[in-house]
């Protein structure tokens, strides 16, 4: 069910007023016992003065069945302001150069009621199957048990995000050059997550849902387009874009063992990589005549100390307690999600020929190679080996800059730990597309009833420039 009222009118030739009010009620049946239901109202009011000053107000008041009474509806307002500077009289002397200049800013809130994990009606506790029971002398009578699953939460409500944006649109020489710049900031509050710090003595079989997490995200976007025709034969079209976005976890319900340690996610980006800091490879000088680490060198507790050998990775004792354990893991590198994404390209035309090229790249993105038992020779059986297998530490090749540390005929647990030794910068610049085309003259194609025909050859992912190996 949906109903809408709209109003549009211009007063005195310079006052442009628009208004809209919407009611929406939806029921969606996907085959479950109960259909999904939503309800809400929305409104918009916009005012433009003399095609120069623009203001717009929006709101949404939405309800969700997932929450208890008193928590089901959320109010989400938004406001946008714009100033078309190029329409001002004082811009007329430079109108041949600056054909469009607009300043704009927005602020708004949005909501999310999708809890996740296929969870509906968060205020109702669930009942799940549990262990079975058998009776009788031969245990022939068999029945499944039932127990409480996720406990209902009455104070769960909408997850919200507050978005702020400021931007500028600039057009030069009647649109031959167009530049768009946006700066943005987002703050997400009351994120749905299952609590990890509830003690087992509370009696919950499964973690309890709560509005707990907070995340901030900020960055900027830049895009540039250039179109120019030099003469009847030559023309060029070029574009470039650049996006930078950085997020930070402000609040998260971390396990008690993580709080206050180097492994805490608070204050770090979402998906932050964690690992040990690799200082170097052990050398013969680090061991005594019995093959044990010399006094003063922190013990590494990832395998039997007697298994440590020259060529194994030496890690930093971050907390200075005299031994290296998982507690010494810390934030390393960044995240697998790139913070920088960019691209640029151009198409040059000469008469009926055109040549186009497009590059794509990312920056500030990292990856930890491998994982447990991935080192060659770690009792993995028959299979392919890496082409750089010779770039490894051996007594005859005791270099510190080898790719592989010491290998053995069995797994070397010490060297398989997530650490900066395996951290790689995954930034790259790629020649994404290269295309050469030729448009057949219309005097040829019209003779066979074809309005236009273009022949082209295209290559994709032809070159990649990266420090990764």
Regions inferred by a protein language model and the residue ranges of each:
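Surface-exposed, low-complexity loop segments enriched in small/polar and acidic residues
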Residues: 1-2, 6, 14-18, 28-30, ...
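Surface-exposed extracellular loop regions of Gram-negative outer-membrane beta-barrel proteins
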Residues: 2-26, 35-68, 72-89, 161-164, ...
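Outer-membrane beta-barrel signature, preferentially recognizing the C-terminal barrel domain
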Residues: 32-34, 109, 132-178, 208-231, ...
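Extracytoplasmic gating/loop element in the C-terminal half of outer-membrane beta-barrel translocons
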Residues: 310, 362-454, 459
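Short loop/turn motifs that connect adjacent beta-strands in outer-membrane beta-barrel proteins
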Residues: 10-17, 52, 86-101, 117, ...
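Flexible, surface-exposed loop regions and adjacent strand-edge segments
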Residues: 33-41, 72-78, 120-128, 195-204, ...
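Solvent-exposed loop/turn elements at secondary-structure boundaries
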Residues: 92-160, 178-215, 253, 257-259, ...
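Conserved small-residue
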Residues: 119-120, 210, 227-334, 376, ...
């Amino acid at each position: 069910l949906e109903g809408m009222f709209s109003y549009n009118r211009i007063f005195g030739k310079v006052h442009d007023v628009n208004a809209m009010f919407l009611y929406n009620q939806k029921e969606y049946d996907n085959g479950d016992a109960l259909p999904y239901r939503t309800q809400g109202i929305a409104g918009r009011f916009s005012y433009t003065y003399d095609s120069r000053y623009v203001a717009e107000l929006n709101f949404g008041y939405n309800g969700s069945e997932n929450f208890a009474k008193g928590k089901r509806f959320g109010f989400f307002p938004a406001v946008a302001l714009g100033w078309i500077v190029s329409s001002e009289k004082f811009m007329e002397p430079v109108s041949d150069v600056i054909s469009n200049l607009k300043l704009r800013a927005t602020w708004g809130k949005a909501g999310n009621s999708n809890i996740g994990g296929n969870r509906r009606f968060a205020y109702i506790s669930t009942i799940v199957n549990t262990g079975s029971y058998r009776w009788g002398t031969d245990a022939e009578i068999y029945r499944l048990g039932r127990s409480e699953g996720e406990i209902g939460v009455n104070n769960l409500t909408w997850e919200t995000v507050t978005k702020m944006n400021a931007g500028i649109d600039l057009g030069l020489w009647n649109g031959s050059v167009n530049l768009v710049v946006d700066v943005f900031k987002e703050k997400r509050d009351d994120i749905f997550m299952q609590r990890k710090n509830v003690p087992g003595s509370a009696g919950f079989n499964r973690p309890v849902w709560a509005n707990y997490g907070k995340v901030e995200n900020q960055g900027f976007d830049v895009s540039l387009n250039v179109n120019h025709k030099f003469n009847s034969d030559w023309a060029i079209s070029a574009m470039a874009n650049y996006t930078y976005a950085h997020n930070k976890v402000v609040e998260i319900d971390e396990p008690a063992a993580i709080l206050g340690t180097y492994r805490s996610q608070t204050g770090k980006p979402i998906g932050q990589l964690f690992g040990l800091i690799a200082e170097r490879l052990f050398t013969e000088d680090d061991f005594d005549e019995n093959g044990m680490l010399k006094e003063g060198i922190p013990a590494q507790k990832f395998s039997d100390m007697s298994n440590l050998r020259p060529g194994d990775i030496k890690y930093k004792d971050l907390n200075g307690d005299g031994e290296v354990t998982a507690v010494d893991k810390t934030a390393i590198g960044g995240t697998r999600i790139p913070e920088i994404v960019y691209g640029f390209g151009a198409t040059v035309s000469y008469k009926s020929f055109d040549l186009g090229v497009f590059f794509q790249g990312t920056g500030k993105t990292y990856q930890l190679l491998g994982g447990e038992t991935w080192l060659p020779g770690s009792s993995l059986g028959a299979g392919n080996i890496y082409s750089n297998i010779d770039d490894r530490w051996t007594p005859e090749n005791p270099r510190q800059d080898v790719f592989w540390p010491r290998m053995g005929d069995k797994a070397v647990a010490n060297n398989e730990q997530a650490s900066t030794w395996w951290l790689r910068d995954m930034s790259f610049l790629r020649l994404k597309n290269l295309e050469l085309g030729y448009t057949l003259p219309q005097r040829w194609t019209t003779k066979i009833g074809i309005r236009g025909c273009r022949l082209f050859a295209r290559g994709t992912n032809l070159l990649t420039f990266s420090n990764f190996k």
